[in-house]
Amino acid sequence: MRVLLLMRGAPGVGKTTFIKENNLEQFALSADEIRLLCQSPVMTTSGTFGISQDNEKKVWSLLFQILEARMQRGEFVVIDATNSKTVEMNRYKTMAQTYRYHIYCVDFTDVPMEECKRRNLTRPDYKQVPEEAIEKMYARFATQQIPTGIVKLRPDE
């Protein structure tokens, strides 16, 4: 069976940790890892290093090119990204229909925001995001639903 597994949740919520704990790293495409391939961490206004968001078109173009190549071969693929917008997830649905894939989404949006903020502080400095970014992401999750046709899973299932 052809399977595309999407992670969904705010930065720092545990998506990448889930992938590591379940030995899925070799199957994962990570937007953050592609960002780091496109540009080294940059100095932020707070004097720490962070992952640049300046190359988003290139990052997502590369991610979808690699995803399509893997789907053409029928490979199992995990997407490590926030997947906070319904329209983004619909793009995966379109590809899944083309390549006859089943889509599952491990949804971390039930993790309390305060826990996510706490976890964010335990990340390496360059991977931490401002608290406002986490708050904005949680507000978006409240209005953006997982599309029909994508099976929602909880991290503990």
Name what the model sees in each region:
Residues D54-I103:
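Glycine-rich phosphate-binding loop used to anchor ATP phosphates in small-molecule kinases
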Residues M1-V13, A31-C38, V78-K85:
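Charged, low-complexity, helix/coiled-coil-prone segments
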Residues L37, P41-V42, N83-Y126, R140:
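ATP-dependent NMP and nucleoside kinases share a basic, alpha-helical "lid"
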Residues M1, E25, G50, D54, ...:
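Short N-terminal micro-motifs specific to bacterial/archaeal maturation
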Residues M1-R8, V13-T17, E21, E25-F27, ...:
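Conserved GTP-binding G-domain of TRAFAC-class P-loop NTPases and closely related GTPase folds
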Residues S30-A31, Q53-N55, H102-C105, V129-E132:
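Glycine-rich loops and low-complexity Gly/Arg-rich segments
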